[in-house]
Swiss-Prot record:
UniProt keyword ATP-binding present: no
SUPFAM superfamilies, alphabetized: Helical backbone' metal receptor (SSF53807)
Lipid attachment in record (S-diacylglycerol cysteine): 20
A cellular component term, taken from the record's GO annotations: plasma membrane
Annotated family: Belongs to the bacterial solute-binding protein 8 family.
Record-level GO BP terms: cellular response to iron ion; heme transport
Full protein name: High-affinity heme uptake system protein IsdE
NCBIfam families to which the protein is assigned, alphabetical: IsdE
Encoding gene, per UniProt annotation: isdE
Keywords, alphabetical: Cell membrane, Heme, Iron, Lipoprotein, Membrane, Metal-binding, Palmitate, Signal, Transport
Amino acid sequence: MRIIKYLTILVISVVILTSCQSSSSQESTKSGEFRIVPTTVALTMTLDKLDLPIVGKPTSYKTLPNRYKDVPEIGQPMEPNVEAVKKLKPTHVLSVSTIKDEMQPFYKQLNMKGYFYDFDSLKGMQKSITQLGDQFNRKAQAKELNDHLNSVKQKIENKAVKQKKHPKVLILMGVPGSYLVATDKSYIGDLVKIAGGENVIKVKDRQYISSNTENLLNINPDIILRLPHGMPEEVKKMFQKEFKQNDIWKHFKAVKNNHVYDLEEVPFGITANVDADKAMTQLYDLFYKDKK
């Protein structure tokens, strides 16, 4: 009997000890043993909204959350420094699916699995927010953020659908020295559609196409949006010069009616970001400012 009693106590003790160790291990993971390195600004801003610490951040001229001010920089989003990242001993290095192919050599040098998230549209970003919440124990924060974005989107769509006429919109995405035309497949194109605008470009298989001003004149948009990507002040000056020196622009209805607008990188940008609520609201107000 004594032997049986002793074995029973021993088994119970082992079970309790194992349970405690398991609980401790799970709690350790929950309490932030993740060492996360986002390689893009959009991901960095999203992690901030999810109340997640990071050990590395992308190098950018944009203002990042103050909570990350002392976090080491790891280089540009498409060219992160492998050695700088390795020094941080990350558990997760995050990127976006748009540049997945370009980032594969980087992950190979790191000898790490790549984590890619869809930030090509509002819907894609919201799905990614849910994934990040599940992955890093921030489900409640992810739900709260998505609920807010859904609420703003629904309000904008409900107001837009009541408008009798929807403006035809041309979207130009500029980089220093040149510009492209954005389609519905781009993030900014997605926002324009949500806000009640009709993109004059009907291409379905690409996010951006090259510009042909003569063809654009034939579809004569009501509104022209100009969005900078990188070096915004330089791009803004480039657009101003183009519209002043290229005579064809003066024949556009949008130019004649002074309906050409320069968008700011914040809250817009070429990839989805957590400022989408502000971007949707600004576009709606722009499209229907005379019909409130």
